[in-house]
Amino acid sequence: MSSNKINKKSIARIAAVQAIYQNILQNNDDMDDIMQNVLSFYRNDSSITNLTGNLKISLSISHFKILVKSVFENINKLDEIIDNHLTNDKDPAHMPILLRALLRAGIYELLFYPTTPAKVVINEYTDIANDMLNGYEIGFVNSVLDTIAKEKNKIS
């Protein structure tokens, strides 16, 4: 990147995955508390500077909040969609937490953000997966999101 700046929606997506992950890990239903914890990290300049050097990072707070709240309002439907894309030999209970968090956010955006092109959503979440997951899981994220994008009209 030439500008040392990352798109605000990209950062919001990463932060949303972090909040969703934190919810699963802590089994904490207080989403407002979780969102405030994640937002406080991104608002703390010293936290960000230590991780990024001179890279400018800020997130779209509105995109973050809408995405996180909407995922939790639709969590059962999203988990059903995820579980339906597992092969018969995969137990949904054994899916890695981070993988489930990322898929929840990505699937929600594919199904309920019609103004964002599917290709953008797939690329964004595959990039996030590339930074957070292993090779098989990255391919799985790409495959599931691509399949859902193609089946979108049947699902939503």
Curated annotation (Swiss-Prot):
Transcription regulation found in the keyword field: yes
Q: Which Pfam families is this protein grouped with?
A: NusB (PF01029)
Query: What InterPro entries does this protein's entry cite?
Result: NusB-like_sf (IPR035926), NusB_fam (IPR011605), NusB_RsmB_TIM44 (IPR006027)
Q: List UniProt keywords, sorted A-Z.
A: RNA-binding, Transcription, Transcription antitermination, Transcription regulation
- The reply on keyword RNA-binding is yes
GO molecular function term, any single one: RNA binding
Q: Which GO terms describe its biological process?
A: DNA-templated transcription termination; transcription antitermination
Q: Name one GO cellular component term.
A: cytosol
- Report the sequence similarity comment from the record: Belongs to the NusB family.
Q: Which PANTHER family match?
A: ANTITERMINATION NUSB DOMAIN-CONTAINING PROTEIN (PTHR11078:SF3), N UTILIZATION SUBSTANCE PROTEIN B-RELATED (PTHR11078)
**UniProt function note:** Involved in transcription antitermination. Required for transcription of ribosomal RNA (rRNA) genes. Binds specifically to the boxA antiterminator sequence of the ribosomal RNA (rrn) operons.
The protein, known as: Transcription antitermination protein NusB
